[in-house]
Amino acid sequence: MGIGYFNKDKTPDFFVSFAQGTWPDLSWTKQAMIDGATGKIEFSDSLGYYQTSSPIAVDFNEDGVDEVLLNVDYQVLDSIGLKSFYNTLLVISFETKEVVTLVEGIPGHNVASTPWAGDLDNDGFLDIVYSVGTNQFKTYTFDGLRVNYIGTKIPMTPKHQWGAYMGSEYDGVFKKK
């Protein structure tokens, strides 16, 4: 779950991403954004193949409204039906109702690694770090890991409140603005 200000009111909102099925037959993931003020589901989708990484909240376009950054797996079938898995980062804007691919698919699968957003190099701009398992032919494997870095020119003021697993302070506490 990720917490942020996904609309223009002053009440924090919630974004959840969860697998559907019964273990070990978990195949697809569903997502929903719940308006914190009304309790209504304002966004619902099924993006990608099974993974349990948490979403984070970042104001990418600096308009005072957070977007969700979500690590998503998807599968591709070749001409003889062999599955390959790829991983990408998606940005979801609830203001524009857009889902935008931040990076092209990387071969591999991410079961449970949440992206991180903050100022890694202390230059005042947003950095994103995320990881992907390197085995593109099997899920639920941990036989290789690729750590990826994205540097941006998005200013880090104010600090993002939910830029990591369980929030930017890693304590599961969301501090209202």
Predicted features, each with a name:
Residues M1-N7, S53-F60, N71, S113-L120:
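Beta-propeller blade termini
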Residues K8-F18, E62-D73, N122-S131:
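Acidic/hydrophobic-patterned starts of short beta strands in beta-sheet-rich repeat architectures
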Residues A19-D25, D73-S79, G133-T139:
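Short glycine/acidic-enriched loop and turn motifs that connect beta-strands
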Residues S27-K30, S84-Y86, D143-G144, K159:
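A detector of repeated loop/turn-to-beta-strand junctions in beta-rich toroidal repeat architectures
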Residues D35-T38, F94-K97, K153:
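Short loop/turn segments that connect beta-strands within beta-propeller blades
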Residues K40-S46, E98-G105:
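A short beta-strand motif characteristic of beta-propeller blades
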Residues L47-S53, I106-A112, M166-Y170:
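Short coil/turn segments at the loop-to-beta-strand junctions that recur within blades
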Residues T114-K177:
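Blade-level signature of beta-propeller repeat domains, shared across WD40, Kelch, NHL, RCC1
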